[in-house]
């Protein structure tokens, strides 16, 4: 079994974590990644190396996602060179918030289901920092909207996976905290089932040791959704501009509306393919799926809007409800089908 501990500017708790794992899981191979902490923290890393951990070092801070990728790449080289069979990997935070018994539970879950991505899920009861509780609710809700799958703890750092998943893990986007969320988003699309095992919720000193930056890292985590929203707004601007220009040139409203929609839809398709989703299938195939989706959404828009107005909802409110629902549906379908 491999245990990965990414660390940035740690304290003495890192040493305690490594000591506890070494004592209670003596066969585990511990990999600590120094993510550019600086010379002032070398004593902590030297001590973990003395205890028996392998320490990998980034010259500068690259982010948690990059630290995990560095560890995955190291493990892959070791597995290949030593001709090792599939092994469970468990990622653990450096601040002591993950208990040994929970690390063992996650590892056992991977041994039983090696194709799964296993999450150590906290219950979020008791004294949980407000930002942690709120952040997890937002990301869990967004994840469920996008994938249709319920995950109770999207931000857990205690995760398990098999070494067989390393090639997939190394190809995921993101180098900071968004990497872990991207891992969840891409798991279902790639055919890797997500499962959870309950773990004890532990927060030390109100989670002050966390290097999560609420604004900057939240933007990174939600960037796929924000990019999708941005392309939708830009497409609307293109649609309106094209409509006015075409109508001024042709004086034909129907032709102008149709051509403007074709131009804006084509623009959004290209933007979503190259900026938001990065599909594995060909652009032609994705484009065909996209325009089929556009036609379906257009029909749904009409029927849903007319139905809401028919039951007495005002046109403005009905339009708002319709566009919001179809926006979420569109994102989910494009993520899971159109640009898969």
Give residue ranges: language-model regions.
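Cell-envelope/extracellular polymer assembly enzymes that use nucleotide-activated donors
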Residues: 1-2, 29, 182
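Acceptor/aglycone-binding surface of glycosyltransferases and processive sugar-polymer synthases
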Residues: 54, 60, 66-74, 100-177, ...
